[in-house]
A protein has these predicted regions:
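Bacterial N-terminal signal peptides that target proteins for export
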Residues: 1-7
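N-terminal signal peptide c-region/cleavage motif recognized by signal peptidases
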Residues: 16-18
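Patatin-like phospholipase
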Residues: 21-63, 71-372, 376-389, 393-395, ...
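Gram-negative/organellar outer-membrane beta-barrel architecture
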Residues: 365, 382-551, 555, 624-638, ...
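C-terminal outer-membrane beta-barrel translocator/porin domains of Gram-negative envelope proteins
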Residues: 408-413, 543-547, 551-663
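Secondary-structure transition into beta-strands, especially the periplasmic turns and strand N-termini
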Residues: 507, 598-600, 667
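C-terminal hydrophobic structural anchor segments
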Residues: 658-691
Length: 730
């Protein structure tokens, strides 16, 4: 019977392979690797020393992370290969269900830049979310990539080194030991349990985190145990949820743990003080591997004595096993491609989009790309794959999919020194049919409040026809040369019909028709400022826009380019504006990242907006200020040094340069300079207004969005100002 490789994490892995271990007349040696999440990285260092000591290994048994390391070792991965592999992984990504930003569609990228969390709801979401916070598909797909050739359900005793792993059946609390199959398990409460027959299986660390008894039952006469568990904590150290939960788990299996300790011949206890199951940072991984080596070296005399007990000469070295031929660029010959849970229309599109062809060689990277596309562009809730061997050679590629979530609740929240607090709430519902449709409702609360409804349908993947309506109440202070000039309150109505097409995953093009109504209240002017003669304004406009995006991160990117361009033609009756020719607006923005070193980057940018026509209405005048496009007004362009909104002339061009230094892993120091040209007409751009501004800022890249504080100066305002932002920008 075959079982898909499902959720893996700092969890336990049981894998599949074949070959037969060769028995000998000497005593059999079993290596036992305990669980411990990230602390299990120390097993790699310990295995290096055991190998260098010339100890033959006949059995490997592991729990949790110990089963991941032990499973890979048993199929031929060397400690050196595993050392290199774990160091280059992005563990924060692997231990999540995130889709790589490079594979996300444009809508998902925009959502990831606004919402703190997303919560699925509906029939599908209820059944899929029960039992854990994360499904673990990214680690599952990595494990599939690492074990090509061993995806069939087989006997683990026929691996190059016989292997077993431990899990717990939470139906009855019994320990379940796996010696065959294709299975991955989960950390209780974090990764979703695996259901097998009548069992519900989770991480075996709760019942047997140091499974010496399993190795003995397999035939091991001598046990080398590597233990990366924390010692039991005294009362004064049990002061957090994590420490209390860890203590409870350790206490549950304490009696069996003590018994297994007595059955250990060479005990390698790793010093993991200061580290937890979640310590997956590069520096932590490096330290834990080194501590594993040091702990094993401290038992060198015991290893020498063990070798003598085996009757082996001090110069004896076991014959090396064939190393596993891993390469992320490896290609495999695929005979058949099958799917569980994929719509036929989506299947045809995916095969064409990813260039997946039967009876051809396909790279593992291409397969990984296909799984990401299934979860992004086609919006399946999870996608994993396996590669069972095909009759006559080669492999069959089999994708396992979960249905799309029907509904999602998205929430965003932010605080800043201009608007204090703002809350963004969105509900999106997907309707599956011959033509997929989406209904989205969005509300914003704060000083400026808004409501928006979007309805769209996809006649083909990545092609969308959309209808939208938005109401927004605005209360905006306008400034002139750094001093408040007037306040404007108004109600804004938007109706839109659009067609958008994603030509490639990084490029989106859209065209459409908009209706806009600006319903102004009376303006409040500061003394000495001239008034605008503004009544209700409305527009029918035609627009075309393009968005190109390759940033690796929405905030604090380290590579890539972001570019936007748009053209709008404004009328009040579809053909003219105010009984004369329509006016138009051209807007462009381009920013890139030049990585100078691993920590230092330069971010040049150029952007502008140009109005063409006469008698430009107040609602469409150019505006600048703030640190993000469209902050208060759709046409607003950012300018460091001006924190508020300032109206400018019809032609506005801005150049910007940022110098960014990363400190630690999530802290950033940014120096910014920008220069602006503004004129009544484009041809006068070099002759009229010039402005410059600069700023220095600190940023923290947090799970709740960027936390930023900056000091800024601009010659137009001729004053130093401070700006603070906490959270995603919307």
């Amino acid at each position: 019977m075959k079982f898909p490789t499902l959720l893996i994490a700092a969890g336990l892995l049981c894998i599949s392979v074949h070959t037969t271990a060769q028995p000998g007349p000497r005593k059999k040696v079993g290596v036992v690797l305990s669980g411990g999440g990230a602390k299990g990285m120390a097993h790699i260092g310990a295995l290096k020393v055991i190998e260098e000591a010339g100890i033959p290994i006949d059995y490997v048994v592991g729990t949790s992370m110990g089963s991941i390391i032990g499973g890979l070792y048993s199929i031929g991965y060397t400690p050196e290969q595993m050392d290199s592999m774990v160091r280059r992984q992005d563990w924060s990504f692997l231990l999540s269900d995130k889709i790589p930003r490079s594979e996300q569609n444009m809508a998902e990228r925009e959502a990831s830049e606004k919402y703190v969390f997303s919560l699925p709801f509906g029939k599908n979401a209820k059944t899929q979310a029960v039992g854990g916070l994360i499904k673990g598909q990214n680690l599952a797909n990595l494990f599939s990539e690492l074990t090509v050739g061993y995806h069939d359900s087989i006997d683990f005793n026929k691996l190059p080194i016989p292997f077993a792993c431990v899990s717990e059946n939470i139906v009855n609390g019994n320990e379940v030991n796996f010696h065959k199959g294709v299975l991955a398990m989960a950390i209780p409460g974090v990764f979703t349990p695996v259901r097998l027959d009548s069992m519900v299986l989770v991480d075996g660390g709760v019942v047997n985190n140091y499974p010496v008894n399993v190795a003995r039952a397999m035939g091991a006469d001598i046990i080398i145990g590597v233990d990366v568990q924390n010692d039991l904590k005294p009362a004064n150290e049990l002061n957090s949820t994590g420490s209390i939960l860890g203590q409870l788990i350790n206490l549950m299996g304490l009696e069996l743990y003590k018994k297994n300790l007595k059955e250990t011949d060479t005990y390698i206890k790793v010093d993991v003080e200061g580290y937890s199951a979640a310590s997956f940072t590069p520096s932590a991984v490096d330290t834990l591997i080194r501590r594993g080596e040091e702990a094993a070296l401290a038992q060198k005399n015991s290893l020498i004595k063990l070798k003598q007990e085996l009757g082996l000469d001090s110069t004896y070295m076991p014959k090396p096993l064939p190393s596993y031929p891993y390469s992320p660029n490896r290609k495999v010959y695929i005979k058949e491609i099958t799917f569980d849970g994929l719509d036929e229309k989506d299947k045809r599109w995916l095969l064409k989009r990813c260039d997946l062809k039967e009876d051809s060689e396909i790279s593992l990277r291409r397969i990984e790309e296909a799984t990401a596309i299934l979860c992004s562009n086609l919006e399946y809730s999870s996608a994993t794959y396996n590669l069972p061997e095909a009759p006559g050679g080669g492999y069959n590629l089999h994708f396992l999919l979960s249905k799309k979530y029907e509904n999602k609740l998205n929430v965003g929240i932010r605080f800043d020194s201009e608007e204090t607090a703002s809350l963004l709430i969105n509900v999106t519902s997907n309707f599956r049919g011959k033509v997929p449709t989406t209904l989205s409702l969005t509300g914003r609360l704060g000083k400026r409040y808004a409501a928006r409804i979007d309805y769209g349908f996809e006649p083909a993947p990545l092609k969308n026809i959309g209808l939208a309506y938005m109401f927004q109440y605005n209360d905006i202070n306008f400034y002139h040369h750094g001093d408040k000039s007037h306040n404007s309150t108004y109600r804004y109505h938007l109706g839109e019909l659009s067609f958008s097409d994603v030509w490639y995953k990084n490029i989106r093009f859209a065209v459409g028709l908009r209706y806009e109504l600006y319903d102004y209240d009376k303006f409040l002017y500061q003394e000495g400022n001239q008034g605008f003669d503004v009544g209700t304004e409305h527009f029918f406009s035609y627009f075309a826009q393009m968005h190109y995006e390759t940033f690796d991160k929405a905030y604090f990117p380290t590579k890539g380019i972001s570019a936007r361009a748009s053209y709008s033609l404004y009328t009040d009756n579809f053909t003219k504006y105010d009984d004369h020719a329509p006016f138009s607006a051209i807007k462009g923005y381009c920013q890139g990242v030049i990585p100078v070193t691993r920590r230092f980057s330069i971010l040049p940018a150029i952007y502008g907006r140009f109005l063409i026509g006469k008698d430009i209405p107040y609602s469409k005048l150019n505006a600048m200020g703030g640190d993000v496009q469209g902050r208060f007004l759709q046409q607003q362009l950012p300018f460091v040094g001006i924190n508020n909104v300032e109206l400018t002339k019809n032609a506005l061009l801005i150049g910007s340069m940022k110098f960014r230094q990363r400190m630690g892993s999530v802290h950033y120091l940014t120096l910014t300079g920008n220069y602006a040209l503004s004129a009544s007409k484009l041809r006068y751009l070099l002759e009229q207004d010039t402005m410059f501004g600069c700023g220095i800022g600190y940023g923290l890249d947090s799970m709740f969005g960027p936390l930023e504080a900056s000091l800024n100066y601009a010659n137009r305002a001729n004053k130093v100002s401070m700006y603070v932002n906490l959270g995603f920008k919307f």
